Structures are given as C-alpha cells and as structure tokens.
UniProtKB/Swiss-Prot annotation:
PANTHER family (alphabetical): DNA GYRASE INHIBITOR, TRANSCRIPTIONAL REGULATOR YGIV-RELATED
UniProt family annotation: Belongs to the DNA gyrase inhibitor family.
Organism per entry: Edwardsiella ictaluri (strain 93-146)
Name listed for the protein in its UniProt record: DNA gyrase inhibitor
Tagged with keyword Cytoplasm: yes
Length: 155
C-alpha cells in the first residue's frame, strides 16, 4: 500500500449521521442522502467520515457521517427534516492511500493502513475523523476504488 502525506484544505460537506455497525448503517444512510441530494440536483464527491475505532467501540455505538462534498453555502430548506446538516472535513495533514476493495471487504485495507503502512512511513493518527472518498460505485459488484484518509502527525 502506498501512502502519501499531504496537506488538505477544509472541505465543506452535507452530512447525515449514522450509528451502528458500519456494514449495516452506511448503506441506508447513503441511500437517504443520495435520494435527498438528487431531489435538489446536488453533485459532488461521496465520502464517509468515521469518528470511532471499531477495535475500541462497541458495534452499536459506532458513529459515522455519510457525506457529499459541496460548494454551496446554504443547506436546502428540507435538509434538517431529513437529518442532513452542513459539516466539514477539517483541513490539515493527512495520510492518503488509494485502495481497491473486493467483495465489500472495507476492513482489510483499513487494517493494513493502520497496522502496517502508517507505522512504516513515520506518522501516527492525530485523533480526528478518518474518511473514505468513493472513486467508484461498487454497489452492484462489491468492487470499489477508494481513497482512505487519516489525519496524522509526525512520530
């Protein structure tokens, strides 16, 4: 796995909070956000932001935001009724890795990033939310191209 360390600017988002096991909570969250954004003609990149470590937090308590990047300053009027709010991916130093997911196995690349790739490049997580940026749509095939992002600091 190749990791790049880059400084990212803050990215405004429309987000919908989900809670529970990631494999069960993210799909319905994305469906809801996609339906809402389609009604408003919104376009952007799809992301998931992860706030909890599944090695440390019980599955039912895991929190994530499904997100759509936006340049809009205003949340459409029905956003809050759908549980959608404005948010942001914080700017700062990130470790980025482009990975391919097969059979919807999202855990394996994350484990490799945290257990092998980050220690090897001399950086450690900085405590902020990690993210996935979806570069392809694998809903039908289980095959995904993703960018994984972890806020980091030098060891």
């Amino acid at each position: 796995m190749q990791v790049r360390i880059v400084s990212l600017a803050a990215q405004p988002l429309f987000v919908l909070r989900v809670q529970g096991p990631f494999a069960q909570s993210l799909g319905p969250g994305f469906e809801r956000l996609m339906a809402w954004s389609a009604r408003h003609g919104l376009r952007g990149q799809w992301m998931a932001l992860y706030y909890d470590n599944p090695r440390e937090v019980a599955p039912d308590a895991l929190r994530a935001d499904v997100a759509l990047t936006t340049a809009s300053v205003t949340l459409p009027s029905d956003g809050e009724a759908y549980g959608i709010r404005r948010g942001a991916l914080a700017g700062g130093l990130y470790a980025l890795a482009q990975v391919r997911v097969t059979d919807n196995d999202f855990a394996t690349p994350w484990i490799a990033l945290f257990d092998q790739a980050l220690p090897a490049c001399g950086y450690r997580p900085d405590g902020g939310p990690c993210f996935e940026r979806y570069l392809s749509d694998g809903r039908g095939s289980g095959e995904w191209l993703l960018e994984l992002g972890v806020p980091v600091r030098k060891n």
